Every structure is written in C-alpha cells, then in structure tokens.
C-alpha cells in the first residue's frame, strides 16, 4: 500500500534536532534491561513549582490544605516555597514551622537562587526547623548562557560555586537545624553533559558530599527536549560520572513539554536515579511537571508499593482541584472521571466476564475476591483499590442516552447536572432501556429522572417512596459558630421533630441522620439558579457516600439552604430504596 502522506508545508527548517545541540552517547547503556522493583524517594513540589504556574496562586489557606494532603498521602520531602522571592512564601514557611505543622519525619524543602541576599533570606525563613533541604539552582544550558546571562562556562561555574559557598556560610546561623543540600543545574537537558557534571561535582565538593553527608543532585528536564530514552542515557552517564557517587542522591525533575514526562521519569529512574520531583496530576509550568499520581500508580499496577497512599483518589483529586483552582482532565490516568469507564459494548462485555472469572477464581481458592490477583480486561487496576466504585465501569455513552439526557435536562428543565451526576443518570436510563427496549422519549426520560432523584408523595401513580421528607426547618448560628438545625421531618410517613448541630446546616443534618443510624458523608456539592430573578428556585446537587455506595442527590427549593438539605435527603432515600442501608 502506498503511503499517501504529503509534506505539511510547516517551517520545520527553523528547528534544530536535539543531537545537533547536545551530544549524548552511551553505547554501553544498562537501563533497558532493568526493572522497577522499589519506589524512589519522592519530593512533591506542588507548593512551589506547581503554585508558580497557577492563574490564581494558592492563598495561605489553600497552601496549608495542600501541605496537609501531601503529608497525609505519605510524602516525606515537600518543597514548600521560594522564601526569598516573596513575603507570601516567606510567611508560609514561617507558618509551617511556628505552627507545628511539620511532622517529625517530614523534611521541608526551600528554593533559592545563587545570590547572597536571597540565600541569607532563605536561612532566615528556616529558623526553628528541625530539618530542611536548601535547594540551590542556577541555569547552565547553552541557550541560557548565551541569551540570558551572556556568560561563558567559567562564569556560570563561578556563579554555582559561589552560591554553594554562601550556603555554607549562612548555614552557621542555623545551629539547631539539620540541613541537606540540593543543587540543580537548571535546564540540564540543554547543557553539555561534560560541563554539567563538572559543575555538579564542584558544588558537591563544596557541600562536602559523602556517604554520611549526602547531597541531592537534581537534573531537571526544565524543558523536555528529546525522547525519554535519550534522557535516560544522560541520567545513566551522569550517574557514572558524579563523585563521590555514594555521597550523591541523584534526583529527577522532568517536565511534560513533549507529553512524555512520566516515561522520562521511569526510564531515568531505571538509569540510576534515586529520587523524583513532581506534582500531583502534573500541574506546573507550560505542559506541567511530571505527574506523581501516574508515576506512583504505574508502580502500584505492577505490584510495586509506591510508598504513597492513593486509596482515596477522588478525595485527592477534589483537594488538588480546590487548591489549584484547576480541574483534573476527565481522561487523567487513574484520577479522571472517565478512566475506568468502558463505553464500548465489547469492552463492557469483556469486563463483565473478567469480574465473573475473578469470582470463580476466588471461590475455587477459598479466598475473598479482594485477595485475588487482579486480572480484568481494560482495567489496569481495581477501581476499589483507589476508593472508586464499580458503578463507573458500567456507565454508557451518548448512544445510550447520556448526551441526550444532559441536553434535555438543561434546555427544557434548566438542570445543569455535574458531569459525574450526568454519567450516573445515564446508567439509570440504560437500565430502563435494557428492561423495556425501544426508544425512550423525552417525557419518559424526565419521568425517569424525577422518579430516581425526587421522592414521590403519597398517591403518586408510581407509588410513594422515600423514608425521609424534609418539612419546616430553621437554622441558627450558635455563639461558638456552629449551626443548630431544628426541623420537622417525616420519617416513614410519621412527622417527627429532630435537632442537630454542626459546622453549617448540611453538617447538622448529617448528624441528625447519623443519630438515626444512617452513615452519610458529603463528597461534592454544587448548585445553581433555575431561572433569573428574585423568585428563582435553586437546584442543589450533592454527591454522598451512603454506607458503601457513592451516589448523587437532587434538591429543588427557592431557599438554597433548603435545596441543599433536600439533596442530601434525596441521596439517602435513594440508597435506602436500593437496600444500601437499613
């Protein structure tokens, strides 16, 4: 068959191939035959490298929430800022130290350029810390030497070594803090290897690198310039030529400009690296830093403990989205809404048979399904191991009604369902079409929606359902800031007065339900007006965990507080109707 591709006409002559800029020759490479068997040392740089790339940089409260998430997940080295660059970063470092937020086994990392007043300010920020990593960097690439610094190799070498000497000088001001040094030849991928290793070795010598006093040498793909195999060759070459090797913690800092940051990190780790820096879900400048979630769960999927807890991936994603004020893409590996969803009928059939095979294997071995080796077509990991439910797996595409239902609800009923609620309801429609067959009309879809999410009153043609119904209520704020909720509720058809307190009306209602034996947590919440004007009703959508099930509830009311409480009641009633709770 003849290749019909034609020249694009794009100005390719403007771009130099990497091998014409930087020579990387490693004929005796060993990394291709190696396997990843243990996790590297991790360093999360969300609070610095990630934060600087945000349209709306994190507030102190969002920074603290991100730090607490990283600690909870198990990261032990966390870059927390560039304290000499802004008062905001300086104050946040002080807040962490003085507020007692840093666990004993966690080391904060701070970034500084190789300039004396910046280094001095950096050490001032660390007063009182038990231990810290001081991360010194300067750019060494051919391009930046020429167009940014107008310096030759000797000039850039002097900048790096003088910076290291100044770090040692100001270290004397922190007698009670254990300092570990990190040095980054920024834009390493654009730097000649023989020059990069000379600079790194000179800095490591000043920092007195040894087996008992290890120095982190971090090799950033500040801009990803070449295929991951060439990056791995450069890492293995550096690993062979850094001295003393036992005194060096070789670190990677890949970016994703070419879309291969994860592959570069994995191959670089095989090539001799000990440590990887990155951000959750790949936040960072331009196309982002390497994604620590994908890296960790790639290892997990191969039976290697990432030493990081990803067991509640949705909560991790929600927190990261809140802190960054950026959404994680729906196709983001492991964490996106759609990554465990099979739209193809043949895929769904294979997955169904895979689950059946797991159950047979577990029965034959006399063990629980959760203890069997995972082997289900199209699903690289068990969604439940990441805190997901299997409901995502059986969601359907627009051919089964999702697109049409979403359009209908928004255009004719002004209901703008969150994406995950749209997908959940598409499963409801699919089950109905499977049971009755044929085309489902718009009226039938709307009836299905109201029957699913809005409890029916007595006398409804489809029969009454819904254990709980919210009647009159009032919410008062107590002196301590908590909310006292008093409500008249119909429970199994009997009106009862119930009261509860919490951090807001929803929390108070959750406590009322908890006292009634219903375990419910709110995972996500959104609301919008159904029309314009002062008399508009509000629609509230609440994603809840009720027992072992995650599902959505809907509430509609002129009062936004009441609509949100009705949404919680909707989710609880649905779970009870489906026999998910007693």
Curated annotation (Swiss-Prot):
NCBIfam families: leuA_yeast, PRK03739.1. Residues 456-582 are annotated as: Regulatory domain. SMART domains: LeuA_dimer. It catalyses: 3-methyl-2-oxobutanoate + acetyl-CoA + H2O = (2S)-2-isopropylmalate + CoA + H(+). InterPro entries: 2-isopropylmalate_synth_dimer, AIPM/Hcit_synth_CS, Aldolase_TIM, IPM_Synthase, LeuA-like_post-cat, LeuA_allosteric_dom_sf, LeuA_N_DRE-TIM, PYR_CT. It is found in: Cytoplasm. The keyword Cytoplasm applies. GO terms for cellular component: cytoplasm. The keyword Metal-binding applies. Belongs to the alpha-IPM synthase/homocitrate synthase family. LeuA type 2 subfamily. Residues 40-314 form the Pyruvate carboxyltransferase domain. Keywords: Amino-acid biosynthesis, Branched-chain amino acid biosynthesis, Cytoplasm, Leucine biosynthesis, Magnesium, Metal-binding, Transferase. GO terms for molecular function: 2-isopropylmalate synthase activity; acetyl-CoA C-acetyltransferase activity; magnesium ion binding. It comes from Renibacterium salmoninarum (strain ATCC 33209 / DSM 20767 / JCM 11484 / NBRC 15589 / NCIMB 2235). Pfam families: HMGL-like, IPMS_D2, LeuA_dimer. Disulfide bonds: none annotated. Catalyzes the condensation of the acetyl group of acetyl-CoA with 3-methyl-2-oxobutanoate (2-ketoisovalerate) to form 3-carboxy-3-hydroxy-4-methylpentanoate (2-isopropylmalate). This is 2-isopropylmalate synthase. Mg(2+) binds at residues 49, 253, 255, 289. It comes from the Bacteria. Pathway: Amino-acid biosynthesis; L-leucine biosynthesis; L-leucine from 3-methyl-2-oxobutanoate: step 1/4. Its EC number is 2.3.3.13. Its cofactor is Mg(2+). Homodimer. One of its GO terms (biological process) is L-leucine biosynthetic process. SUPFAM superfamilies: 2-isopropylmalate synthase LeuA, allosteric (dimerisation) domain (SSF110921), Aldolase (SSF51569), post-HMGL domain-like (SSF89000).
